[in-house]
Amino acid sequence: MPKLTIDHIPVEVPPGTSVLEAAKTAGIWIPHFCYHPALGSVGACRLCAVKLLDGPVKGIQMSCMLPAQDGMVVSTTDPEALKMRSLVIEWLMMNHPHDCPVCDEGGECLLQDYTVAGGHGIRRFEGKKRTHVNQDLGPHIQHEMNRCIQCYRCVRFYQEYAGGSDFGVMGSARRGYYRRFQEGTLESPFSGNLVDICPTGVFTDKTARFRARYWDYEMAPSVCPHCSLGCNTVPAARYRELLKTMARENPAVNGHFICDRGRFSNAAVNDPARPRVPLVDGEEVSWAAALDATMLRIEEFMELYGPGRLALIGSPRLPLEGGVLLARLAGLIGTEYLCYFAGRDEGERVAAAVSLLADGRTASMADVRKADCVVILESDLRDEGPMMLLAVRQAWRSGAPVFLVGKHAPLAQALAVSIEAIELSIIEEVPLAIFERAVVICGTRNNPPAATESLAHTDAKIAYLFPGPNAFGAGLLMKEHGAVALAEAVASGRVKGIIAVEADIPEALLAGVPFVVAADWLPTETVRRAQIVLPTAAWVETDGTYVTFEGRAQRFRKVMASGLPIRGLPARYHASPDKPAPLHPPRVHRSVSPGGELRPAWRFVAELIERCGGDAVTEPFVGRWERLRGLDPEGEGVMLWEF
């Protein structure tokens, strides 16, 4: 392993490591624009200049392009290197519009930071600036080409990493223009990553444009709830409104990126039609009154129908805390009808997959990226897990063949990321035995339990995509407490009432029961049909835990206070008819924010447990789940197989 010295600090790194990366391991930050850990080095920006004082190479060198070698003595603070970096910044700023006050990147802009750090403050260039006309790239990405510094990050990610073909660079040198051939929405399902990967303000989030500065945002480490992959994110909110979502690095999960669904699906949280106030028979009441009414109706229900006729239903999107407590509540009420999947077929498929993966055969997205063979079995990854498709592309770029097996594995998903895939009818046609790191990717939507069991006879690792962010956790709980056929129980009249906690129940089942209590944050059909509605907090309004498709428990943190967004508050919250408050807080003082009477789903279940005679619940994770209490939201998560 090469041993070198950087700023008087001895460093030892693996062969092939660049000087820039070696400096990072020693805690030394060398300014750079074009280098990115997921993309590698290209040497376009020339900002990472260092001076080599001794060793095989000497003089000013670009640290991102220079492999570390034995005997190197590197200085990042040599006056000659500092002068070089200062000149590079000045060159980059020659054509810059200097529009930081109106740029959404202000406060998180690398160009801004390095310009200040490099001491460039006086513009000496008196010539005419080069200018460009911006393109309309669709509803999500704002294009401001005049801020470009030609680092090539955007086109390298879009074309090489994500396999997009409708965006690239036109021209060369200072005339380079990063664009589509014609205006229009970017086609890649990962185009939103241009916002994160651009070191300046060329690509910004159009959905949050002019809404806040970086330092205005409330942010916390979180987990994407839009599929079972568990991509790590940083949601950003202001004034009780979720404005945007950014990717958070986790090498074991999503790497550096997220899909556009996870980035731009923020509207549901801000929806004014969300359940925000407890309702009893359509009338707004307090939480205490709603809980009193719930207990009274449950007692009346038991007297009328007897014990055991009430079903408790969770869902794949209910955080693990609520699912664990539902099992405890079922024991207190005395019902055997505890369900985590309203549809029987879905529950059976998830249970079969969880049983198959119980021996630790599950493949992470990191495993997929390093696989030497990938099989996509009866699954469309664009729908069931877009970031898994991006992981498959990285395996394909490294030489792994990709097989599409079955009628539910369309070729279009491979074409979306420019993969040359091989289509087959049955998995037995794939020569899995000749590969060392083969991975089979399948989903529970189109794979029956029998097909799942057939995978047990292969040596390949398996990546099973589930129907929700905590479907794996729900499957474990269902396996522990047993599965029931809810539809048959409702049809036969054995179930006459339902308490649904963040569950989407088919309309046919709802029509068969006279008593429904719904605790949810989405305006579902279950909520519309319920006699009692308890509004719960969305994932950005509370702490919680999701278990990903591979059995990895990950904690997400509360990002913002619950309540109606200040922008567009209903008229009843305005100070007066003459002083509407569409964009700033109303001048009315209240003890609770408008629409802010929301509680975590597990807290609602805990209240019922206590009112049914159970012990007070201060912590949902007890017994075998206790190890999850101290889960670090910024870590890689904990594999449930470990305990």
What is the meaning of each model-derived region?
Residues 1-16, 24, 36, 53-57, ...:
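N-terminal export/assembly segments and adjacent metallocofactor-ligating motifs
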Residues 48, 64, 152:
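Acidic, glycine-enriched active-site microenvironments
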Residues 67-68:
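Periplasmic N-terminal soluble interaction domains immediately after the signal peptide in Gram-negative
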